[in-house]
Swiss-Prot record:
Matching PROSITE patterns: SPOVT_ABRB (PS51740)
BP GO annotations: negative regulation of DNA-templated transcription initiation
Domain of life: Bacteria
Principal location class: cytoplasm
Localisation per UniProt entry: Cytoplasm, Nucleoid
Protein name: Transcriptional regulator MraZ
Annotated Gene Ontology cellular component terms: cytoplasm; nucleoid
InterPro entries in the record: MraZ, MraZ_C, MraZ_dom, MraZ_N, MraZ_sf, SpoVT-AbrB_dom, SpoVT-AbrB_sf
Length: 152
């Protein structure tokens, strides 16, 4: 399970170091392999452990190749998907096309979302956090069926 947000600097070769607390699990449970792709509605990258990505692929297989929307959805996720291996220092290389998609330069945020990570350009992460906070404040959470009884 991945949780928390970590500020990570990307080096000149396009590598980021996965936080140490996740490295052993990724190596042991997922053979050090993660799959990186684009998000469908935000300028960030999604990073899935191999086992989690295989579940996504199974769902994508069920989508139509003849329905234009479903085909476009598959193309976006699968067309950008890249296998990435943790090196001996726990780093992964972010492919140039994916760096460009998410406008990644040096300062990034790696955000754990239980079964995957999101990778954001740092200022874009802050902006979406501000936007998300404003959205939460402006909404009646009780009107959302899944949030109505959510308690912390």
């Amino acid at each position: 399970m991945f949780r928390g947000a970590s500020a990570i600097n990307m080096d000149a070769k396009g590598r980021i170091a996965i936080p140490a607390r996740y490295r052993d699990a990724l190596r042991v449970e997922h053979a050090g392999t993660v799959i990186m792709t684009v998000d469908i509605d935000a300028a960030c990258l999604l990073i899935y452990p191999l086992h989690e990505w295989e579940q996504i692929e199974a769902k994508l297989k069920l989508l139509s190749d003849t329905d234009p929307l479903e085909r476009s959805f598959k193309r976006k996720l699968l067309g950008h998907a890249q296998d990435c291996e943790l090196d001996s220092h726990g780093r992964i290389v972010i492919p140039p096309a994916l760096r460009s998609f998410a406008s990644l330069e040096k300062k990034t945020m790696l955000v754990g979302l239980l079964n995957k990570f999101e990778l954001w350009e740092e200022s874009a992460w802050q902006q979406q956090m501000d936007d998300g906070n404003a959205l939460i404040q402006s909404q009646d959470l009780a009107s959302n069926e899944r949030l109505a009884h959510f308690s912390l």
